[in-house]
Protein backbone atom coordinates (compact mmCIF):
# COMPACT_ATOMS: atom_id res chain seq x y z
CA UNK A 1 0.00 0.00 0.00
CA UNK A 2 1.32 3.41 -0.98
CA UNK A 3 2.01 5.82 1.87
CA UNK A 4 -0.17 8.93 2.10
CA UNK A 5 1.16 12.39 1.33
CA UNK A 6 -0.87 13.97 4.13
CA UNK A 7 -1.91 12.65 7.54
CA UNK A 8 -4.68 14.70 9.14
CA UNK A 9 -4.68 14.21 12.91
CA UNK A 10 -7.71 15.01 15.07
CA UNK A 11 -7.61 14.69 18.87
CA UNK A 12 -11.10 14.72 20.34
CA UNK A 13 -13.26 14.27 23.42
CA UNK A 14 -16.67 12.58 23.82
CA UNK A 15 -18.42 15.93 24.36
CA UNK A 16 -17.57 16.90 20.78
CA UNK A 17 -18.69 13.76 18.95
CA UNK A 18 -21.18 15.69 16.77
CA UNK A 19 -18.52 18.20 15.72
CA UNK A 20 -16.11 15.34 14.99
CA UNK A 21 -18.70 13.64 12.78
CA UNK A 22 -19.22 16.85 10.77
CA UNK A 23 -15.48 17.47 10.42
CA UNK A 24 -14.64 13.93 9.37
CA UNK A 25 -17.51 13.86 6.87
CA UNK A 26 -16.15 17.06 5.30
CA UNK A 27 -12.63 15.59 5.18
CA UNK A 28 -13.76 12.19 3.86
CA UNK A 29 -15.73 13.85 1.04
CA UNK A 30 -12.87 16.05 -0.09
CA UNK A 31 -10.12 13.43 0.32
CA UNK A 32 -11.69 10.81 -1.96
CA UNK A 33 -9.06 9.69 -4.45
CA UNK A 34 -6.31 11.72 -2.78
CA UNK A 35 -3.31 10.31 -0.86
CA UNK A 36 -4.65 11.43 2.53
CA UNK A 37 -5.10 9.52 5.79
CA UNK A 38 -7.45 10.85 8.46
CA UNK A 39 -6.85 9.74 12.04
CA UNK A 40 -8.72 10.70 15.19
CA UNK A 41 -8.24 9.73 18.81
CA UNK A 42 -10.94 9.96 21.45
CA UNK A 43 -10.89 8.73 25.01
CA UNK A 44 -12.66 9.16 28.33
CA UNK A 45 -10.39 12.08 29.24
CA UNK A 46 -7.75 9.75 30.67
CA UNK A 47 -5.17 11.40 28.38
CA UNK A 48 -4.39 15.07 28.00
CA UNK A 49 -4.71 16.66 24.56
CA UNK A 50 -0.91 16.79 24.47
CA UNK A 51 -0.65 13.03 24.94
CA UNK A 52 -3.35 12.44 22.29
CA UNK A 53 -1.42 14.62 19.84
CA UNK A 54 1.77 12.63 20.53
CA UNK A 55 -0.03 9.30 20.02
CA UNK A 56 -1.52 10.47 16.71
CA UNK A 57 1.85 11.79 15.58
CA UNK A 58 3.43 8.43 16.41
CA UNK A 59 1.05 6.42 14.18
CA UNK A 60 0.86 8.90 11.28
CA UNK A 61 2.31 7.62 7.99
CA UNK A 62 2.04 10.67 5.74
CA UNK A 63 4.95 12.61 4.31
CA UNK A 64 3.34 15.63 6.00
CA UNK A 65 1.11 15.83 9.10
CA UNK A 66 -1.42 18.48 10.08
CA UNK A 67 -3.56 18.72 13.19
CA UNK A 68 -7.16 19.88 13.14
CA UNK A 69 -8.97 20.28 16.44
CA UNK A 70 -12.42 18.73 16.64
CA UNK A 71 -14.10 22.13 16.98
CA UNK A 72 -12.26 23.72 14.02
CA UNK A 73 -13.07 23.38 10.34
CA UNK A 74 -11.33 23.66 6.99
CA UNK A 75 -11.91 25.00 3.50
CA UNK A 76 -13.60 22.80 0.89
CA UNK A 77 -10.30 22.50 -1.00
CA UNK A 78 -8.13 21.87 2.09
CA UNK A 79 -7.07 18.32 1.16
CA UNK A 80 -6.54 19.04 -2.55
CA UNK A 81 -4.50 22.18 -1.84
CA UNK A 82 -2.26 20.43 0.70
CA UNK A 83 -1.72 17.50 -1.69
CA UNK A 84 -0.73 19.91 -4.48
CA UNK A 85 1.63 21.76 -2.14
CA UNK A 86 3.14 18.48 -0.87
CA UNK A 87 4.60 17.72 -4.30
CA UNK A 88 7.58 19.91 -3.37
CA UNK A 89 10.17 18.90 -0.81
CA UNK A 90 9.93 21.39 2.08
CA UNK A 91 9.77 21.40 5.87
CA UNK A 92 6.30 22.88 6.25
CA UNK A 93 3.27 23.69 4.09
CA UNK A 94 1.98 27.12 5.14
CA UNK A 95 -1.34 28.82 4.46
CA UNK A 96 -3.73 31.37 5.93
CA UNK A 97 -6.32 30.87 8.65
CA UNK A 98 -9.39 32.72 9.86
CA UNK A 99 -9.07 32.95 13.63
CA UNK A 100 -11.91 33.97 15.92
CA UNK A 101 -10.71 34.60 19.47
CA UNK A 102 -13.86 35.23 21.50
CA UNK A 103 -15.56 37.87 19.33
CA UNK A 104 -12.45 39.20 17.57
CA UNK A 105 -11.53 37.90 14.12
CA UNK A 106 -8.23 38.02 12.26
CA UNK A 107 -6.63 36.47 9.22
CA UNK A 108 -3.55 34.58 10.38
CA UNK A 109 -0.74 34.33 7.85
CA UNK A 110 1.55 31.40 8.74
CA UNK A 111 5.12 31.84 7.39
CA UNK A 112 8.47 30.63 8.70
CA UNK A 113 9.92 34.14 8.78
CA UNK A 114 7.20 35.36 11.19
CA UNK A 115 7.42 35.41 14.99
CA UNK A 116 6.02 32.44 16.92
CA UNK A 117 3.60 34.60 18.87
CA UNK A 118 2.86 37.39 16.41
CA UNK A 119 0.64 40.13 17.82
CA UNK A 120 -3.05 39.22 17.32
CA UNK A 121 -4.51 41.85 14.99
CA UNK A 122 -8.33 41.94 15.24
CA UNK A 123 -9.85 42.89 11.88
CA UNK A 124 -6.37 42.70 10.36
CA UNK A 125 -3.63 40.26 9.45
CA UNK A 126 -1.81 38.43 12.23
CA UNK A 127 1.60 37.16 11.15
CA UNK A 128 2.76 34.00 12.91
CA UNK A 129 5.24 31.19 12.54
CA UNK A 130 3.50 27.99 11.31
CA UNK A 131 1.78 26.21 14.16
CA UNK A 132 0.70 22.56 14.34
CA UNK A 133 -2.32 23.24 12.10
CA UNK A 134 0.05 23.71 9.16
CA UNK A 135 1.29 20.57 7.40
CA UNK A 136 4.72 19.68 8.76
CA UNK A 137 7.12 17.12 7.35
CA UNK A 138 6.45 14.13 9.58
CA UNK A 139 10.10 13.48 10.41
CA UNK A 140 10.48 17.05 11.71
CA UNK A 141 7.17 17.03 13.57
CA UNK A 142 8.11 13.80 15.33
CA UNK A 143 11.27 15.42 16.70
CA UNK A 144 9.05 17.72 18.77
CA UNK A 145 6.97 16.65 21.77
CA UNK A 146 3.61 17.98 22.91
CA UNK A 147 3.61 18.53 26.66
CA UNK A 148 1.25 16.50 28.85
CA UNK A 149 -1.36 19.18 29.47
CA UNK A 150 -4.78 20.33 28.33
CA UNK A 151 -3.91 23.86 27.23
CA UNK A 152 -0.76 25.41 25.83
CA UNK A 153 0.69 22.13 24.59
CA UNK A 154 0.58 23.50 21.04
CA UNK A 155 2.67 26.55 21.97
CA UNK A 156 5.24 24.31 23.66
CA UNK A 157 5.42 22.16 20.51
CA UNK A 158 5.77 25.08 18.09
CA UNK A 159 8.65 26.53 20.11
CA UNK A 160 10.54 23.29 19.41
CA UNK A 161 9.48 23.22 15.73
CA UNK A 162 10.69 26.81 15.34
CA UNK A 163 14.28 25.54 15.57
CA UNK A 164 13.79 22.99 12.76
CA UNK A 165 11.95 24.71 9.91
CA UNK A 166 14.10 26.09 7.11
CA UNK A 167 12.04 25.82 3.90
CA UNK A 168 8.33 26.37 3.33
CA UNK A 169 5.74 26.19 0.59
CA UNK A 170 3.09 28.88 0.98
CA UNK A 171 -0.45 29.23 -0.32
CA UNK A 172 -2.30 32.51 0.31
CA UNK A 173 -5.57 30.55 0.51
CA UNK A 174 -7.54 30.46 3.75
CA UNK A 175 -7.54 26.73 4.49
CA UNK A 176 -8.22 26.54 8.24
CA UNK A 177 -10.87 28.11 10.47
CA UNK A 178 -10.17 28.38 14.19
CA UNK A 179 -12.64 29.54 16.81
CA UNK A 180 -12.03 29.99 20.53
CA UNK A 181 -14.67 31.08 23.02
CA UNK A 182 -13.53 31.25 26.65
CA UNK A 183 -16.91 30.13 27.99
CA UNK A 184 -17.11 27.13 25.62
CA UNK A 185 -13.55 25.88 26.08
CA UNK A 186 -13.09 22.32 27.32
CA UNK A 187 -9.39 22.92 28.04
CA UNK A 188 -9.47 22.74 31.81
Describe the residue ranges of each PLM region.
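A recurrent flexible, glycine/aromatic-enriched loop bordering the glycosyltransferase active site
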Residues: 115-136
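Catalytic donor-sugar/metal-binding loop of nucleotide-sugar-dependent glycosyltransferases
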Residues: 160-177
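Short, acidic, metal-binding catalytic loop of nucleotide-sugar glycosyltransferases
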Residues: 3, 22-35
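The conserved acidic donor/metal-binding loop of glycosyltransferases
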Residues: 69-73
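Conserved donor NDP-sugar-binding/catalytic core segment of glycosyltransferases
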Residues: 79-108
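Acidic donor-binding loop at a coil-to-helix junction in glycosyltransferase catalytic cores
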Residues: 151-157
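Glycine-rich, basic loop-to-helix element that forms the pyrophosphate-binding segment
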Residues: 44-60
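Short aromatic/hydrophobic "clamp" motif used to bind/position activated sugar donors
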Residues: 65
Amino acid sequence: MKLPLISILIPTVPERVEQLIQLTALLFNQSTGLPVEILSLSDNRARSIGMKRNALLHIARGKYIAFIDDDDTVADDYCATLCDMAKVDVDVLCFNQISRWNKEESIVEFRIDHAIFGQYMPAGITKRFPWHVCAWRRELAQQCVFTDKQWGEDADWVMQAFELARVEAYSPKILHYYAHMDEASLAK
